Amino acid sequence: MNTYAIIDTGGEQLRVEPGRFYDMRHFTLLNPSILDSNTKVLIYRVLMIHHESNIALGDSWLEDATIKGRVLHSHFKDKITIYKMRSKKKMRRKLGYRLNLARFVVDSICFDGKEFYK
């Protein structure tokens, strides 16, 4: 059984399957300390669901579709370094930052009152 969904979160679109884990940036605009381990999450911004040979597409989002999951932990990604230089002007600038990511696992995909597990 090949079930997956495409969700919109954190400014990007992800293809998610039940039983797999994913790293998401900008998971919530709330305080990151709220995202403790095993915090349950419901995602309503589901763009498409594929189950066996059926495909359900939404006009922007699907109405009766949710993704149930839980947050495993939050962590930082490797540091991204930005180096700007203008030749012959003696201008050099070095900046860097680390993205705050939340790793979560998809428990099930719900659509029209049915739940699809792994």
From Swiss-Prot:
Record Pfam families: Ribosomal_L21p
UniProt cross-references to HAMAP family, sorted A to Z: Ribosomal_bL21
Function of the molecule: This protein binds to 23S rRNA.
Highest taxon of the lineage: Eukaryota
Family the UniProt entry places it in: Belongs to the bacterial ribosomal protein bL21 family.
Main location per the UniProt record: plastid
GO molecular function, one term: rRNA binding
Classification lineage: Eukaryota, Viridiplantae, Streptophyta, Embryophyta, Anthocerotophyta
Protein name per its UniProtKB record: Large ribosomal subunit protein bL21c
UniProt GO BP: translation
Binding partners and assembly: Part of the 50S ribosomal subunit.
Organism listed in the record: Anthoceros angustus (Hornwort)
Subcellular location: Plastid, Chloroplast
Record keywords, A-Z: Chloroplast, Plastid, Ribonucleoprotein, Ribosomal protein, RNA-binding, rRNA-binding
Gene: rpl21
Span of the signal peptide: none
A GO CC annotation given for this chain: chloroplast
InterPro entries in the cross-refs: bL21-like, bL21-like_sf, Ribosomal_bL21
